[in-house]
Each structure stands twice: as C-alpha cells, then as structure tokens.
Curated annotation (Swiss-Prot):
Segments of skewed composition (Basic and acidic residues): 13-25
One example GO MF annotation: protein kinase regulator activity
Organism: Arabidopsis thaliana
Protein name: Casein kinase II subunit beta-1
Sequence segments annotated as region (Disordered): 1-97
PTM summary: Phosphorylated by alpha subunit.
Subunit structure: Heterotetramer of two catalytic alpha subunits and two regulatory beta subunits. Interacts with CCA1. Interacts with LHY.
Compartment(s) where it occurs, according to its Swiss-Prot or TrEMBL record: Cytoplasm, Cytosol; Nucleus
Start-end of Acidic residues biased regions: 78-97
Comp. bias regions, Low complexity: 41-50
Organism domain of life: Eukaryota
Family: Belongs to the casein kinase 2 subunit beta family.
Task performed by this protein: Plays a complex role in regulating the basal catalytic activity of the alpha subunit. The tetrameric holoenzyme CK2, composed of two alpha and two beta subunits, phosphorylates the transcription factor GBFl, resulting in stimulation of its DNA binding activity. CK2 phosphorylates the transcription factor PIF1 after an exposure to light, resulting in a proteasome-dependent degradation of PIF1 and promotion of photomorphogenesis. CK2 phosphorylates translation initiation factors. May participate in the regulation of the initiation of translation. Stimulates the binding of CCA1 to promoters.
Lineage: Eukaryota, Viridiplantae, Streptophyta, Embryophyta, Tracheophyta
GO CC annotations, alphabetized: cytosol; nucleus; protein kinase CK2 complex
Amino acid sequence: MYRDRGTVNSRPEVVDRKRINDALERPSPSTSRQVNGKGKGTVTAATTTANLIGKQQSNNINHRDSRSASLSKNNTVSDDESDTDSEESDVSGSDGEDTSWISWFCNLRGNEFFCEVDDDYIQDDFNLCGLSSLVPYYEYALDLILDVESSQGEMFTEEQNELIESAAEMLYGLIHARYILTSKGLAAMLDKYKNYDFGRCPRVYCCGQPCLPVGQSDLPRSSTVKIYCPKCEDIYYPRSKYQGNIDGAYFGTTFPHLFLMTYGHLKPAKATQNYVQRVFGFKLHKP
C-alpha cells in the first residue's frame, strides 16, 4: 500500500547502487520494508530516491539486509541464476505479489517468534480496543497490515511513509500479544514450540529444553523479548541478534504461563540438578 513489495531489477551499476544505499541509510533497523505491486498508493522510499538520482536507475533498492534476499530474477538473468536467488530468499514463495503484509512480516529474518494473526481477528474492532492511543498513524498502519489501499497515500512524504511502516510493525506486535492468548493463537504458537522456533534453554542441566517467548512488561518500549524456560523457570536473552531487538510487549508477560496451563502435558519436571562448585575436587562451603 505505502511501499512496493516484490520484484526489482538487478543491474550491475555498482556505483549508482552504492549511492542509493547511502541515501537510504537510517538509524532504525526495523521501521521500513519494500513491498510490491498491489497497487498501493505511495511510492517506496527507494523508488523516490532513485528518481531523484535520474534516469540512470530504474530499479528499486531494498534498504534492509534481511529483506534484500527476496529479490526476484532479472529478465536477463539465466534460469540457473534465478533458481539460486530463490533458494537464498528469506521469504518463501515465488510470487511476491501474492504475499500479504502479515506473511511478509512474519517471514522476515528475526521475526520467527511471531505467528500469523488471522485477518478476521484484526478486523474486529473489539480486539483492537485501546491501541489507537498507543500507535501513531493508527488508521494508515491498520490499512497497511490488512493490505487495504489508501486514497491518501500519495499525499505522504518519504519520512511519513517510514513512520507508517514503523507504526504498522508496532500495531501488529501489540495485536499479536493479544492474539496469542486466544485458542487459535495458542495453537499457532504450539506448532512453533514443537519446531523449536523459540530456541532452547542455554542452561546445561536443562538439557536443551524448548523455551517460550516472554516480555518483562506489557507496555511497549519497556524491554526486549526474552525466552522463558519452563524447566528451570528462568528467562534468558535470545541467541539471535535480530530477535534480541524485538519489543517484549509484542508477547507480553502472560503468554508462556497461560500456554503451559493450556497444554499441561508439555510442562516438564522442574530442574533439580545444579552446578556444584569445586576447588581441587573439593566442594566449596556455602556460608
């Protein structure tokens, strides 16, 4: 809607490409994305910058490293090369035009903790109660999440488009925190838990126990997401540097405990073995 998602041309003008990348550099790593051809109202930040440079470049440049691998084949590239590019893609699927914003967002590198929220849940205003006061550009962010075209899209500046992108990610995260407390949301997170998508406990005596994402606060921008081990009942930082930047409010403080109450058979026995400190083979006395 506000940015084109999908195809780009991959031409070898290295100098121009570098100039565009430099122009698109921003301090926030998770507030923008490249979307294609669903007839969205505004032009991407990359396209705007390319037009300013002139007619030398007609290609849109992806300005986030985790998203650059989703480029589709150039008309002049061989079939073998295009197959290689598709294998390296961060986002599955061969047709970017058919990818919804929600699917695109959940398949980004670092967003493995997120499940896809049903459109019906998002379209129910009751489920979004109170979020409009927390998220700037709320209506436009909601339209972006639902892939709804905006008649006012062309009125926004490049900076405003980026703010809407950031607002959409924040809004989806807050909706996600509510959705995973529903029966459908818990079931979706159960599949991820069984696939170890949330990682394993780094504690040696937990023997690779699967973990669950948890926030230390339900308020956005308070802390980043952590992983909770149901065996030692402690929290740890995610191993991935990408996941370590996700807001903990997008999962909340309730989820892992409600999850284990719902699926009680998955709750492991509490860890009883602890590390023993020794010096020359003798246990240290604990005062």
